UniProtKB/Swiss-Prot annotation:
Descriptive protein name: Pro-neuregulin-3, membrane-bound isoform
Segments on the Cytoplasmic side according to the record's topology features: 384-713
Subunit structure: Interacts with ERBB4.
Protein family: Belongs to the neuregulin family.
Disulfide-linked positions: 292-306, 300-319, 321-330
Positions in coiled-coil regions: none
Summary of the tissues where the protein is detected: Expressed in sympathetic, motor, and sensory neurons.
Side Extracellular, residues: 1-362
Skewed-composition ranges (Polar residues): 149-163
UniProt biased composition (Low complexity): 127-148, 195-207, 254-274
GO biological processes: chemorepulsion involved in interneuron migration from the subpallium to the cortex; ERBB4 signaling pathway; ERBB4-ERBB4 signaling pathway; intracellular signal transduction; mammary gland development; mammary placode formation; modulation of chemical synaptic transmission; negative regulation of neuron migration
Amino acid sequence: MSEGAAGASPPGAASAAAASAEEGTAAAAAAAAAGGGPDGGGEGAAEPPRELRCSDCIVWNRQQTWLCVVPLFIGFIGLGLSLMLLKWIVVGSVKEYVPTDLVDSKGMGQDPFFLSKPSSFPKAMETTTTTTSTTSPATPSAGGAASSRTPNRISTRLTTITRAPTRFPGHRVPIRASPRSTTARNTAAPPTVLSTTAPFFSSSTPGSRPPMPGAPSTQAMPSWPTAAYATSSYLHDSTPSWTLSPFQDAAAASSSSPSSTSSTTTTPETSTSPKFHTTTYSTERSEHFKPCRDKDLAYCLNDGECFVIETLTGSHKHCRCKEGYQGVRCDQFLPKTDSILSDPTDHLGIEFMESEDVYQRQVLSISCIIFGIVIVGMFCAAFYFKSKKQAKQIQEHLKESQNGKNYSLKASSTKSESLMKSHVHLQNYSKADRHPVTALEKIMESSFSAPQSFPEVTSPDRGSQPIKHHSPGQRSGMLHRNTFRRAPPSPRSRLGGIVGPAYQQLEESRIPDQDTIPCQGIEVRKTISHLPIQLWCVERPLDLKYVSNGLRTQQNASINMQLPSRETNPYFNSLDQKDLVGYLSPRANSVPIIPSMGLEETCMQMPGISDVKSIKWCKNSYSADIVNASMPVSDCLLEEQQEVKILLETVQEQIRILTDARRSEDFELASMETEDSASENTAFLPLSPTAKSEREAQFVLRNEIQRDSVLTK
């Protein structure tokens, strides 16, 4: 709308247009605060759902679970293997059952087994020959003996060869001789068997002297020692060879008749008859044990006893093993289970181990395996529960932070809605003349922020004062000047109580002398509890009585201004129609003044109103600490110049502080935005610290130059 159209339109139409524009601005601000963007809608626009992101803690939880299960599984496998090892040690070492009749009671399972007595006597006692058949036929030797030998068997065949006439006196049947056996039948009386012991395969010669009557013919004893009892022995294959003991020979001799003769004896009646030769029993002695020589002592292992057995085939080394070992050289371990099975009467219980030491070692090894598995399981369980607790704490922290962000978004939207409904009256600004006004017109009265809200100070004759109307250009310039640019989000609203989050930039006023505002006073308004206090410059005629009382009550006041925060943006952007109606109200002749960025406390001294006779100027500056009312005009100008110098120094110091603060804020903001992708949405990107400081310095210096030019006029 052009200025002419604005001048022609009624005041109500202008107010309605401004109200509609501000309504749209407020809606956009509310949508931006809610995070919905420009297309967010109006007051009732719902907050868009946030994107759900998969948390890394869940994946790490599953990985930790698998990392804990795998060692437990391996531990159980080890336990099973150890049990199988124990079973193999106890059960797998038991040998097959060995019959007890083939095992010596002395524990010599591999040694020959000796019988105390023969099971039966040899048959056909009337004959002089006892033969033992073998698997291989015998070969007769030159001396009349036949013998055969297999690798593991020794057998002996004894034969009797008779060289006599075909007929023997007193016998009907001739004696037949064969190379294998000799049979003599005596019809008169049983033959007399004489006990003779002769060397193996020995026979009588034809020229031998016959024995005396009644005396047995004997020959020399063998050169090797004999045992008291002749027994049969197992030689590698346990093949028996039966012989007669001396006691049995004596019994047989005593029971025979002296009148009878055998093949080896003759009676006196037949002394002239030719003699025949025969062989007697020969005994194979296999029980001759001799200790081994010194060089053969190492033949038996595991403390076995070495001895030599001399047989017909030669000497053989044998080992008498200790209990628990077996084999040719005692090199095989034999558990006690074999001895239990072989001789259960010697053991009342069942023992599975070879000795107490072996048993203790095996029990200790199995116990160590089980204990190690339990320890590993405990450590794994503790690590799992600790990780689970940490993950739960992290999830709770993320949930709390997410709830805090949602709460901040909802709070900002609620504040914007409350600002739209609040009755804040922005007052129009009336541009004053550039030339100074004569004395005793306008003074300033100031009220400063305090913890409680400040009531508005009204004048009794304020309603009768004339109202100054302003052009739409002036109003738009004032609105444009009073609109703040949105500051970037900061994690802190104040920096250690020294400086707060400063505005990035204040729009330059279209009015060149915006910092030199002739006004009647400054009044403090605080319409909303959570917003900072605003200073408003109000134009009205001087009321000496009111001003005098006001100045006296404000002596020695301290400045304690709260810095503006991010919530001040909706304060100017969310205005409804009721707020804009105030432009045409009797109080529509004021403009907000930005308070000082520093938090200095200054004492303001105000003289009496009766001494004030010059023009007083209200300053709208970044660093206007205090405006003092002085008595004469010349003194006021001097104070203004001094104040400008002080103001420049203060501005430079504050610019330096703001630059450092914003650099730290930008660094923290950048780090937080990179770490948390779900940070709050920002309307504008932050400027670099150098650009900010340069623009602020240019803005402040330009304002000070304009102020100096006005004061020098």
